[in-house]
Amino acid sequence: MANTGCLSPGAFLSKVPEFFQTANEKHITVRLTAKRLIEHDPVEGNLEFDSTNHPDYDVSKKASEISVSSRSDREYPLLIRMSYGSHDKKTKCSTVVKASELDQFWQEYSSVFKGGMQNLIKKKKKKSKNGTISKTGKKNKVAKKN
């Protein structure tokens, strides 16, 4: 497994075209994930992991319905991961983007990301016997009447 570790946002953006080029040549999938980064404190614990007693730190839909007098104004960095391959042949890298730099990063990321999707081929839809095309590409079964 090749792990380039946590790169700077600029270095990560320079790796994106390399990942897409390799994935296009090998005909494999590139996986991209993004999530809020919370550093775990094993001694004191984190309020973010205790949504029952501290619902203001929970970002789920249920927590947004609860009115809370004191809300968390803390800004969290965003962890972005990219990988392709599987098991021993997996190649991956990641970056951490601060909330204040997020808008600029997304603009650069989207332009680089779109450039890597040029080799996508639109799937051909299959026609069924009655001439209609299903959304899944499978034939529509028509029940015969006796």
UniProtKB/Swiss-Prot annotation:
Cystine connections: none
Spell out the molecular function terms from Gene Ontology. Answer: 7S RNA binding; endoplasmic reticulum signal peptide binding
Which SUPFAM superfamilies does this UniProt record tie to the protein?
A: Signal recognition particle alu RNA binding heterodimer, SRP9/14
Where on the chain is Phosphoserine found, per UniProt?
S8
In this chain, composition skew of type Basic residues spans 136-146
Main site of residence?
A: cytoplasm
Among Gene3D superfamilies, the record links this protein to: Signal recognition particle alu RNA binding heterodimer, srp9/1
Task: State where the protein is found.
Answer: Cytoplasm; Nucleus
A Pfam family cross-referenced in the UniProt record is SRP14
Protein keywords: Cytoplasm, Nucleus, Phosphoprotein, Ribonucleoprotein, RNA-binding, Signal recognition particle
Give me the ranges of the annotated region Disordered: 121-146
Task: Note the superkingdom of the native organism.
Answer: Eukaryota
Q: Which residues form a coiled coil?
A: none
- Which InterPro entries has this protein been placed in? Signal_recog_particle_SRP14 (IPR003210), Signal_recog_particle_SRP9/14 (IPR009018)
Q: What does this protein do?
A: Component of the signal recognition particle (SRP) complex, a ribonucleoprotein complex that mediates the cotranslational targeting of secretory and membrane proteins to the endoplasmic reticulum (ER). The SRP complex is required for the cotranslational protein translocation for ER import and preferentially recognizes strongly hydrophobic signal sequences. It is involved in targeting the nascent chain-ribosome (RNC) complex to the ER and is proposed to participate in the arrest of nascent chain elongation during membrane targeting.
The UniProt family comment states: Belongs to the SRP14 family.
Q: How does it assemble?
A: Component of a fungal signal recognition particle (SRP) complex that consists of a 7SL RNA molecule (scR1) and at least six protein subunits: SRP72, SRP68, SRP54, SEC65, SRP21 and SRP14. At least SRP14, SRP21, SRP68 and SRP72 are proposed to get assembled together with scR1 RNA as a pre-SRP complex in the nucleolus which is exported to the cytoplasm. SRP14 binds RNA as a homodimer.
Instruction: Write the protein's name.
Output: Signal recognition particle subunit SRP14
Highest lineage ranks of the organism?
A: Eukaryota, Fungi, Dikarya, Ascomycota, Saccharomycotina
